[in-house]
A protein has these predicted regions:
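Structured soluble/peripheral alpha/beta segments that form catalytic or ligand/cofactor-binding pockets
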Residues: 2-4, 31-393
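Short hydrophobic transmembrane-like helices used for membrane targeting/insertion
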Residues: 8-9, 18
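Bacterial N-terminal signal peptides
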Residues: 14-24
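Cleavable N-terminal signal peptides
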Residues: 20, 29-31
Length: 393
């Protein structure tokens, strides 16, 4: 069966997977943003009217927190590690996706579908080893979902990320599960990659525009299974927009965000190729406690799997303990999870399965002990990453 492109998306980077289909079907400047006309010219729009992510993009905030309809796919990704006063610990994810719909026929109706919006909401109760997740799909028409600079928010039904002068407010409710957080950004946005782009594959435009808010001080309330907890902790936000990214030989990825107790952050990912090799476009970044950023290339680090977990839901086998080494910056840490079962099974909507969950980080930097918490995402271990992604016409 040939799936519509929106059915390919569920995890924060599973959106990368549909970008290949869309085509067949030091810290860079945070200065002036491109206008829509400049995006159109520089982006060299393809036959389906979308721009490509090319070098030279200049980010402008808060404008770039919101929608970029010139690009086929866009996502806003929030995760965090939080604790109640009792020490009871939680992880969470709230992610919003926008996917452009190729419609060659003009339609003035407010019900028309120009974009589809998906959203994912998950809570990891690390104390009780309970994992909850839900998903949504809505059209942009009649304001069922959207990402508006005027309204200063991204939403899908009553799941909302609202921009404020201090940072963000998040709220999501599904049954007797809920999050309601206020977040204050402690650091400026970090642009990932060189010259305004995060290159994901060989070839011009096979990239995204990608930035992160790496340290969001978070407080509020969390409910799971009807039990309510006041919580505090740290969150991470990623925002990417693009049109072309992955290629057929890229079969999955392992991505980690690390927030250390010394005030530093790390983002590292590896793209896996058919045959088991690591793609040379794997990359990452280090953010010092004062906000200075160091971009990491594929040769700068190693990700070594140490322990595996076999899912009782899909039969997939995931590496749930890793060693990460960045010799250039003196880092040697292990990542492990307190709760192996944080797999999302999405056969009823996307047909994709992936692991996304809270992790502990412990090791050394320059020979001194270091520890923290983070989030780990792994795709392509439980069935094809891109089912029917490259069908013949």
């Amino acid at each position: 069966m040939k799936l519509p492109c929106w059915q390919m998306i569920f995890s924060r980077w599973t959106a990368l997977a549909i970008l290949a289909t869309a085509t067949t079907l030091g810290n860079p400047s945070l200065g002036r943003s491109a206008t829509q006309e400049e995006e159109n010219t520089r982006g060299e729009q393809n036959s389906r009217r979308y721009c490509r992510a090319l070098p030279g993009y200049l980010f402008e905030f808060p404008r770039d927190h919101f929608s970029h309809p010139c690009y086929k796919v866009e996502w806003w990704y929030f995760t965090g590690n939080l604790a109640a006063e009792s020490g009871h610990r939680f992880g969470y994810e709230l992610t919003f996706f926008r996917v452009g719909v190729d419609n060659p026929y003009p339609n003035p109706s407010r019900w028309r579908v120009d974009d589809l919006y998906l959203a994912h909401f998950a809570i990891s109760d690390l104390g009780k080893k309970n994992f909850f997740y839900a998903q949504r799909l809505n059209r942009a028409g009649i304001e069922l979902a959207g990402a508006s600079q005027d309204k200063e928010r991204i939403w899908n039904g009553n799941w909302v990320a609202e921009f404020t002068e201090q940072g963000w407010k998040l709220e999501a409710v599904e049954g007797d599960n809920r999050i309601a957080f206020e977040m204050r950004s402690l650091k400026s946005p970090v642009v990932q990659g060189a010259n305004g782009i995060s290159q994901k594959a060989e070839g011009e435009g096979n990239a995204s525009h990608y930035y992160s808010l790496t340290r969001l001080e978070t407080s509020g309330y969390l409910e799971i299974g009807g039990a309510s907890y006041p919580v505090t902790g740290l969150s991470w936000m990623d925002h990417e927009f693009a049109t072309n990214q992955l290629q057929p030989n890229q079969v999955g990825w392992d991505w980690a965000s690390l927030q250390m107790e010394d005030g530093t952050e790390w983002m590292i990912y590896q793209l896996r190729q058919t045959g088991g090799g690591r793609d040379p476009h794997s990359a990452g970044s280090f953010v010092a406690s004062d906000g200075r950023t160091v971009q990491l290339e594929e040769e700068d680090y190693q990700m070594v799997p140490l322990e595996y977990w076999k899912s009782p839901h899909t039969g997939g086998t995931y590496p749930i303990r890793w060693r990460i080494l960045v010799p250039r910056l003196g880092l040697d840490v292990e990542l492990r999870t307190e709760m192996p079962d944080q797999e999302l099974v999405t056969q009823e909507s996307t047909g994709l399965n992936y692991w996304e969950g809270s992790i502990l980080v412990q090791g050394t930097r320059n020979g001194k002990p270091i520890q923290g918490r983070g989030y780990l995402e792994m795709t392509g271990y439980a069935g094809p990453l891109q089912p029917e992604l490259y069908p013949s016409d």
